[in-house]
Amino acid sequence: MARLREFYKETVVPELVKQFGYKSVMEVPRIEKITLNMGVGEAVADKKVMEHAVSDLERIAGQRPVVTVARKSIAGFKIRDNYPVGCKVTLRRDQMFEFLDRLITIALPRVRDFRGVSGKSFDGRGNYNMGVREQIIFPEIEYDKIDALRGLNITITTTAKTDEEAKALLSLFKFPFKG
């Protein structure tokens, strides 16, 4: 069992019950899934770029990503319908907790001039979004073997009803919020 999953059951759940006064432990918010998304607009011109992005995301997530395609043609971006424009991977259960552990303890502290992540990036329904500018903050990516620096979006989907509950949940996981 993942270290953070045990931590959630033993520490986070009782703390949230005490903080918000839930009647049942089943009411306590939990992290449902983590989605990693990498937009690769340059893949329109060069197919190799998409292969590199997929392999980078696979190393980061430990799971094969799905290539996402354009839903409609946009002449200004030289994109046609069904062109590959990015890749994404959805993590659940143990892989999700392992990734979250690596993100909090290893990857985020490796960001240059890191002062914490924004506490305002919640969507109003208890989900958190953040962007990572460079994929090299993850230890799985070797700096010498990458073709270009690429960013990615990380979406943490929770069962929390409000942003306040979601922030309390992530804070108890030692998520490094600013201030």
Swiss-Prot record:
One GO CC term on file: ribosome
Listed GO molecular functions?
rRNA binding; structural constituent of ribosome; tRNA binding
Q: Which Pfam families match?
A: Ribosomal_L5, Ribosomal_L5_C
**Function comment:** This is one of the proteins that bind and probably mediate the attachment of the 5S RNA into the large ribosomal subunit, where it forms part of the central protuberance. In the 70S ribosome it contacts protein S13 of the 30S subunit (bridge B1b), connecting the 2 subunits; this bridge is implicated in subunit movement. Contacts the P site tRNA; the 5S rRNA and some of its associated proteins might help stabilize positioning of ribosome-bound tRNAs.
Family (UniProt) = Belongs to the universal ribosomal protein uL5 family.
Note the NCBIfam families from the entry: PRK00010.1
Protein name, as recorded: Large ribosomal subunit protein uL5
Protein's organism: Neisseria gonorrhoeae (strain ATCC 700825 / FA 1090)
Gene name as annotated: rplE
